[in-house]
Structures are given as structure tokens and as C-alpha cells.
């Protein structure tokens, strides 16, 4: 097994970004074999192997382009597996916690950044208490050196205070220790994120009124300034949920409607409709569509696609300028074009045209193949609808503005000439041609 670790890590050889995914997948295969040892009652042996594996991954950190974070994520899984194996093997929990802390302290590559979020889920109760005690001791030591200021925010404390404060909060959320979390906020100040977490702790305990009070507090704090990464975007949705649980469905619906009017989208539409009585669904659906249509094009398209309102979507697409569609991401338009193509070909063609134009206007040559595919769809749909002039207008625009994009225009002209799309040669055909070329002397 040690040989398998050594072979998979291949220390001394650099792993490029393009190879990093396959490299980590090979590491995962080895990890699965060690995981199996734990299940088969060989936890002690597994601990030794995990130990080598973790250290080996750290040795490899300088020999891999881990821009995608694959090795870092794998390390976190491996670290938690090592903890679980130590616990199953009945190793000293105090020693386990000390090793965890040392890894977190000696973390030159950031593999242990916020690793406490998963660690506390793996640690047993005894180990969590030891971990909490150690972090609390560090926090109190760092906090004791800080000059107190009434208006001080958590983000204004020194790094040692903030780091251990953050870890303590993670521990208290996982252990559902509301009182300890509240005491910590009393000492260091409360952020909107804290309010959301405390509200969720009360919600889990079905103390909905207490939860709602903390949501209200968080929303008030949000208005008092910029909280950066301590801002909370989940408070409004949580408030709707709590109002509903408290029997205040109408208030929850009113709040959902206010949010929908600000940001019409699939998500806000779903939230709104969950709170609507069955007999009022049609009314609220039409109301939401009307508001979205007058507020945001992408939101309106998303909702129409979700609810299959193809007629309304087709009418709206036909009434707007091409430039408006060209500003939208393909995430908003691609599903709409596919859905409209069956019965509303003209509207679908307009969207496909806009999708193609968006790519070539930006000049992203690596996406030209997608632009050509969009134009091919548009050509067929315009022709099927008997609106050849619209296709001709599009062709004139492309030729006039983008004829110097040589890696694109030649293939576009093939579409204009209605030349069939060439099917790529099969692998076998290409390989046999290459064999013939390699084994045949020129005349």
C-alpha cells in the first residue's frame, strides 16, 4: 500500500493544471483502498497510511498547479478520514486534537483554511469539547491583549482574535450551543451573519419567535453599513419561512412579493408561489409575470421557461430590439431558444441570432464554433418560417461588421451557401489514414 501511495503521488514530477484532475482522481482511488481498511477493522493500519498520505500531499504542493483547488479539497477529505480512523482505533483524543491544531497552525499552502467546518462534523463529542477548550484558550489569550472599544466590530480585531473567534462560532453552531454563541457575540459584537446563524439555531429548536427576533436584528444591522463577508443574504428568505411557521402566511407572502419586485428570478418566483394559496395561484402567476416583464428581461425569460409560457415569451421576444437580447448571457437565453423552436420558430431564430452575435461581437475566437451553431439554427428557423429577409439582414450585418474575423467568416459563408455541415472523420478513419501516411514512401 505504501508503494501505491508513492506511485500515485509521484514526488519529483510536476503536475500541470490540465493533468491535475486526473492526478487527484488517482489519489482518490488510493484513498478508497485505505478507507476500506477502516471498514474491515484495520483502523490502526489505516491511520499510519493516512499519516503518510497527508504528509505526501503536502510535499506535492510545490509540484502541482492546483489553481482549481482539487488537491486542496482532496486533502480536506483525507484529513477528516484520518481523524475518523484515529477515533475508530481508540487513539488518545487529546493527541488527535493537538495534531489537528498543529496542522492548522503550520499551514503554508492553505490546505487547512476553514477546515474546522468539516473537522467538527467528524470529531466525536469528547474530541469536540477538547477542540473547543483549546480554541477558547487561544481566543481568550489573544482577546485579553486588545484595547476594548464599545463600537468595535469583529472585523476590526487582530487576526489571532478573528481566527479563533470564527472557529469557536463554527463549533457552537455544530454543537447547537446557542448560549455560548450569544455570550461570544456579547463580548465581541454581533454581525448580520451571526444573527442568521443564531436565528437558525433557534429555528432548529422550534423557537420561531426568538428566531424571528434575531432575523429582525440582522436586517437592521445590514442597513447600518457595509459588512463585507459578514453580510447575510439569507435573512429575508429566513424571515419569510419563520413568518409562515408562525401562522403569518399573509405577512410572509407580502415580504416575498416585495423581494420579487426587486429581483424577479426563478428563485424569487418559486419562493413567492410556495406561499400562495392554491385558489390564487393563477392570479399571482400572472401578476409575477407582468412585473418581471416590466423589470428584467433575463428574469422574465427564466420564469417563462420554467413555467412553459411559450406564447407570452414569444410575443415579448418579438417586441424587443436585437441589442437587448445580445446583452444577455447564454445561460438566460439558450433554454428559451430550444423551448421556443418547436412552435415559435421566429422568436427562437431571433434568440439564436442574438446568441451568435454576442459571441462574435466579443471576439472570443475559442467560442466561434458555438456562434456558428447558433447561426445555423437561426438560418433553418428563418427559412422554415418563410422569413428569408430577416436572415439576409443578419448575414449583411455579420459581413459588414465581422468580415475580418478570418477564423470565423469562412465557416459562416458555408452556412450562408447552405453547404451541409461536414461530419468529422471517425477516429478509426483518421488513424488508418495516418498509418498509411506513416508507412508509405512518397512516389
Predicted regions and their residues:
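Eukaryote-biased, non-catalytic alpha-solenoid scaffold regions
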Residues: 1-443
